[in-house]
UniProtKB/Swiss-Prot annotation:
Main location: membrane
Protein role: Fluoride-specific ion channel. Important for reducing fluoride concentration in the cell, thus reducing its toxicity.
Domain of life per record: Bacteria
InterPro entries with a match to the protein in the record: FluC
Protein name as annotated: Fluoride-specific ion channel FluC
GO MF annotation, one: fluoride channel activity
Binding locations of Na(+): 77, 80
Gene Ontology biological process terms in this record: cellular detoxification of fluoride
Membrane topology: Multi-pass membrane protein
Record keyword Protein transport present: no
Subcellular location: Cell inner membrane
Gene it is expressed from: fluC
GO cellular component: plasma membrane
Transmembrane domains' residue ranges: 7-27, 38-58, 69-89, 110-130
Length: 134
C-alpha cells in the first residue's frame, strides 16, 4: 500500500480544517452569529481557490498527484463545508427564518459557482495576460 496519497490528504485536510475554524471564528468576531458568514466565506473563498488552482496546477503546470490530493481533496475539501451549510440552512428552516434561509442557499450556491468561474478567469489572466503584452 502506498502511504503518500493518504498522508497528503491527511495533512491537507488537517490544515484545511484548522483554517476553516480560524476563518469562521474571525468572521463571527467581525460580523456576529446572526448569519453564517464564516461558512459563506470559506465556501466562496475555497471555490475561488479551487478554480484558480485547477487552471494553474492542473492545467498549466501538471502538479504531482500527491500535491493535487493534498490541495483539492485534503485542504480545500476540509476548508469548504457543505455539511455546515446544510445544517445551518436546516436550522433557519426550523426557526422560520425564511429570508435568511433563502439568502443563505442562494448566496452559497451562486456565490461558490461564480467564484470557481472567477478563479479560473484570474488564473488564465495571470498565466496568459502578461504573455499577450510581450
Amino acid at each position: 500500500m502506498v502511504v503518500a496519497p493518504y498522508l497528503a490528504v491527511a495533512i491537507g485536510g488537517s490544515l484545511g480544517a484548522m483554517s476553516r475554524y480560524l476563518v469562521t471564528i474571525m468572521a463571527q468576531n467581525a460580523w456576529g452569529i446572526k448569519f453564517p458568514y464564516g461558512t459563506l466565506l470559506v465556501n466562496t473563498l475555497g471555490s475561488f481557490l479551487a478554480g484558480f488552482f485547477l487552471i494553474v496546477l492542473v492545467g498549466r503546470f501538471s502538479a504531482e498527484e500527491s500535491f493535487r490530493l493534498f490541495l483539492f481533496t485534503g485542504f480545500l475539501g476540509a476548508f469548504t463545508t457543505f455539511s455546515s451549510f446544510a445544517a445551518e440552512s436546516l436550522f433557519m428552516f426550523e426557526q422560520g427564518y425564511w429570508f435568511k434561509l433563502i439568502t443563505n442557499i442562494l448566496v452559497n450556491n451562486v456565490g461558490s459557482l461564480s467564484m470557481v468561474f472567477i478563479g479560473t478567469l484570474v488564473a488564465k489572466y495571470v498565466l496568459l495576460g502578461h504573455q499577450g503584452s510581450n
